[in-house]
């Protein structure tokens, strides 16, 4: 059943332009710090990406090259033309500061700085085999159970639960497995979240409610979680637009790239409860 209800559109809408080269970046210092002291005037968006994986995820298989969850360079959600790395690198709104490998699970981290606003964007690509850990880390951040900081360009920024917004991108693994715990809010803070995965409102609702997070954009049906939806939603977010305006931006982007009606995109991408 799961295979019939996820990634069905990818057989029609997969991107051909994958980027097999790790992008060159400036030499920018990034140092792990303690998880409490950071510049609270500088805002962060942390994106957790579970790479598409034909072998380890319950998906309708996509072409092998873009469905290898151990190869971020060619993955549908990362190195392909509409993947996070390629799409945001080409954006005029964001500047890529650093690319690095973290460990055997988080295969690559990108750090972007917004060109005009005091926002950083941190995106982590998880080996598709570890989609359950990616999901858990996202929810740990959304609930304030997992907090961290990094030092970049003479600024210490908050990441994970210290972020203003956290996002999950990828297959909805909750269609395949059950998490071992409920990620309850740990600190009384409400974080915004964007969950771009199939039917995420239904599957993530209990966890998001327990985390006391604000579901800024999530989904009611099958969808293709490529980068343009997140990108355009964030264009509104960094300009302090309302939740509804941000949702509309996301829907317009999805309509444009998926060539569906705006009404269909708005029915798919919703905000709040």
Each PLM stretch: what is its role?
Residues 2-9:
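Sec-dependent signal peptide recognition
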Residues 15-17:
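C-terminal motif of bacterial Sec signal peptides marking the signal peptidase cleavage site
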Residues 21-94:
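Boundary/activation segment at the start of structured domains
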Residues 46-55, 124-126, 169, 221:
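Short loop/turn segments at strand-loop or loop-helix junctions that form parts
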Residues 72-158:
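Functional beta-strand-loop-alpha-helix junction segments that form "active/interaction loops"
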Residues 88-92, 142, 146, 170-173, ...:
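Sec/Tat-exported extracytoplasmic proteins
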Residues 158-236:
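Catalytic cores of nucleophile-dependent amide-cleaving enzymes
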Residues 245-273:
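Caspase-like cysteine protease fold
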């Amino acid at each position: 059943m799961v295979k019939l209800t996820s990634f069905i559109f990818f057989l029609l809408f997969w991107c051909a332009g994958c980027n097999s080269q790790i992008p060159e970046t400036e030499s920018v210092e990034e140092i792990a710090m303690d998880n409490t002291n950071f510049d609270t005037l500088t805002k962060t968006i942390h994106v957790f990406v579970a790479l598409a994986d034909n072998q380890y995820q319950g998906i309708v298989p996509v072409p092998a090259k873009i469905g290898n969850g151990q190869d971020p360079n060619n993955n549908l959600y990362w190195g392909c033309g509409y993947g996070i790395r390629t799409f945001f690198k080409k954006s005029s709104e964001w500047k890529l500061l650093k690319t690095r490998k973290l460990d055997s699970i988080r295969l690559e981290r990108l750090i972007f700085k917004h060109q005009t606003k005091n926002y950083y964007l941190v995106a982590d690509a998880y080996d598709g085999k570890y989609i359950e850990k990616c999901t858990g880390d996202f929810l740990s951040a959304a609930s304030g159970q997992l907090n961290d900081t990094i030092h970049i360009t003479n600024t210490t920024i908050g990441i994970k639960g210290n972020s203003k917004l956290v996002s999950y991108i990828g297959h909805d693994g909750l269609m395949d497995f059950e998490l071992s715990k409920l990620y309850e809010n740990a600190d009384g803070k409400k974080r915004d979240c964007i969950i771009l995965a199939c039917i995420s409102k239904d599957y993530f609702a209990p966890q998001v409610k327990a985390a006391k997070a604000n579901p800024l954009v999530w989904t009611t049906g099958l969808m293709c979680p490529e980068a343009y939806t997140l990108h355009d939603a964030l264009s509104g977010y960094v300009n302090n637009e309302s939740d509804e305006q941000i949702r509309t931006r996301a829907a317009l982007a999805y309509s444009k790239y998926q060539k569906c009606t705006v009404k269909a995109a708005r029915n798919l991408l919703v905000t709040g409860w």
